[in-house]
Structure formats: structure tokens, C-alpha cells
Amino acid sequence: MDKLNGSARLMIVSDLDHTMVDHHDEENLSLLRFGALWESVYCQDSLLVFSTGRSPTLYMELRKEKPMLTPDITIMSVGTEITYGEEMVPDDGWVEYLNNKWDRNIVVEETANVSELKLQVESEQRPHKVSFYVDKKSAQEVIKSLSEKLEKRGLDVKIIYSGGQDLDVLPQGAGKGQALAYLLKKLSSCGKPPNNTLACGDSGNDAELFSIPGVHGVMVSNAQEELLQWYSENAKDNPKIIHATERCAAGIIQAIGHFKLGPNVSPRDVDFPYVKENPVKPTDAVVKFYVLYEKWRRAEVPKSDSVTQYFKNITHANGVIIHPAGLECSLHASIDALGSCYGDKQGKKYRAWVDRLVVSQCGSEGWLVRFNLWELEGDVWSCCLTSLALNAKPETPEGFVVTHIHKTWLKGYSSADEQSSKL
């Protein structure tokens, strides 16, 4: 949250499984489309929040499986844990708030003899969440009985049923909705209330997100039965909540456009040749640079001199690239080498994307852009911490020129091929 000096232009609060992440999309195209849009347009002045039922353990597993961005804020374990930044620093104030009228030991004791409840794996049992599986047929009866038992023991709890099988027992003050309300209150108290907030979900445990006053909401097209039922009973006349016609992250992009919250055309949906941006937008320039790089290697653009010439036009004739082991090469020589790599990743489930993009102004017409450059081929991941120097050149057809690229491997994500990423 500290990255912004003022209010976020847009705060997106999204569930992960079957909302931001489409597990039926093997190419992860909608997720990559959203990532390119966010890094290109929103990353510098907006906040990305992931709100998931997953525990930290399962959340980190998902990050190793899918090409996800690094969020500014992560809400996990059905709204019982709030953390900040890549380091995932916990919110101690939220922990203290949840301790009111909560005793995990009593919950475990009272549920031990309920035969219909089956404990989920140990990683899903958290300080303020006890999680079970329960058959859909007996769910409502179990919820009613368990609520009465825990109330008699002096606890104030919330029981959430979602996905047709998951039952979570939480403190009454917990949940995705309360966590979002807490964040909005915290941002407002710092004088930084978001200009707009978009909540995104697909299942019953996301309904609370749409109940927060002033929040826009999108149920993705593949939303589950329990969320659609909640919508028909509680929100069908609310113009701030829509049921998208697109699945998962594509539905989120659709909602940004529907509510007029900002641009919603992903750089991955923009055809080459690119239209000159005036003034230059460094984030957009970098994202498009690597989208085109990926498309060249996947043979998704024509094998044309116009593509390699574009790369040369936007790089300085004397510019250099320093590869992770320290090898220094001419940018133009690297582009010549790229020419021979056309289609070398065709049919190989290869993707390249940028994450954690940060821009620093250098003089009146220069920028230093830092980001993580990820490349994925099959199930092999590599990542370079990348710095790119870029200057405005309004007199040129593209409007800017890259003078320097410096790359180092992210620990644990190096490649045996030192120049595997070429640029």
C-alpha cells in the first residue's frame, strides 16, 4: 500500500481459482491478457489484491503453477489473513481484531463428533480458520446444528459453505467481505481511499465482496450455482454488479470496460505494427516489447523484416544488453540473433511476461524501468531481474529508444542457457 502517495486509481480485489485463474485454460491466455493490461496501464497508480480461500501454502503452490502477477495485497484463508507486498508482511491489527470471541480449540472440540464433517488437509487449518469437507445434501443441516453448538459455548463464528463441498468455520468478523471493508477503512484513514474498487468472484465465499458499499462487482461467466443464487436473491437490481459473459480473467477485463474504470484493451490483443503513443508510456512500451518478443518466437506474427526492424528502431545503435553471467552484447547484434530464432518456440507452450514493473524518472525524458522477466516453456520456469533504460525520442516513428538492458537471474529460476531469453 505504501507504493502510492495518494489514492489508487483502481483497486481490483479478485478471487483466484476459477476467477483470476482459469484451470481449464492450458495456455493461461486470459490470465496473461490481464497481466499485460495491468502492468501496461495500472501497476504504477493502482492496487492489485488477491482474495483467496487458499492457505499461504496452497497459494504459493498456485504461484508456481500459473503465470500470476505479484499482488500488492494478499488476503488468504477466506479473509482470515492479510499480508502486504512480495514479502507478505502480515497485518497484526487484523489478527488482533479476529481474536474477539474466538477459540479455535472449542471449534475443534465441537466438530470432532460431527460425522458428516471431514477435516481438510493440515495446511488448510489456520489460526482463524477450521476447514472441512461436507456433502452437499447434509450441508445446511450441519451448518444450523454447528452454529447453535458454538453459540452456546460463547463463540461468535461465521460458517461459510462454498464450492459444493467446502465448509469453513471462522470468527464472525472474518471473511472476504470484512477483510475488504477493513482494507478500505485502513486506506481511508491514511487519506488514500481508492477512486474505484472492483470485486471479482465465482463462488459462494465471494458473495461478501459484492456487499461492501460503493464497490463494483463482477461475477465471471463461469460463476457457481450458489453465487448466482445469491445474486438473484440479493443483487439482481444492483447496477454495480454484473454477470460477465467472459470466463475468469477475461470477465474481469470485460468488467473494467463495462464500468468505465479505465482502459481495458490488453497489449496482447493489440496487433502489430503498434500505433505510436504520444506521450510515451514506459510501462506500455516495455510490455509490448516482450509481448512481441514472445509472439515472434511462437511464430504468431509474420516472419517479416518489419518486426526485426521495429526492434532495431526502438533500440539505440550503440545500446548494450548485459546477460546474467555478465556477458555484454550489442543490442542490435542480439536483435540480429533473434531473427534466426523465429518460431523456435512454436508448439512448445512457451510464454514470456513481465511482473513487478516499477518506473523511475531519469531527467525530463528518460526512465529506468525495473521488472521481473519471466519465461515459461512447458513446466520449466526462468526469471531475470531486469533493468531497462529508455528515452523519449518524439522525432522517431516509435517515439522512444531503449539504450541499455541489464539482467540477473532470480534465485532459483536460472537457465542452463545463458542467453536463452535473447532480449
Curated annotation (Swiss-Prot):
Maturation and modification: The N-terminus is blocked.
Database matches in InterPro entries: HAD-like_sf (IPR036412), HAD-SF_hydro_IIB (IPR006379), HAD_sf (IPR023214), NTF2-like_dom_sf (IPR032710), SPP-like_dom (IPR006380), SPP_C (IPR013679), Sucrose_Phosphatase (IPR051518), Sucrose_phosphatase_pln/cyn (IPR012847)
Keyword Hydrolase in record: yes
E.C. number(s) listed in UniProt: 3.1.3.24
Biological or metabolic pathway of the protein: Glycan biosynthesis; sucrose biosynthesis; sucrose from D-fructose 6-phosphate and UDP-alpha-D-glucose: step 2/2
This protein's record includes keyword Translocase: no
Catalytic reaction annotation: sucrose 6(F)-phosphate + H2O = sucrose + phosphate
GO biological process, one term: sucrose biosynthetic process
Enzyme's top EC category: hydrolase
One Pfam entry name: S6PP_C
Activity control, per UniProt: Inactivated by zinc.
Source domain of life: Eukaryota
GO molecular function annotation: magnesium ion binding; sucrose-phosphate phosphatase activity
Known partners and oligomeric status: Homodimer.
Protein name (Swiss-Prot/TrEMBL): Sucrose-phosphatase 2
The organism of origin for this protein: Oryza sativa subsp. japonica (Rice)
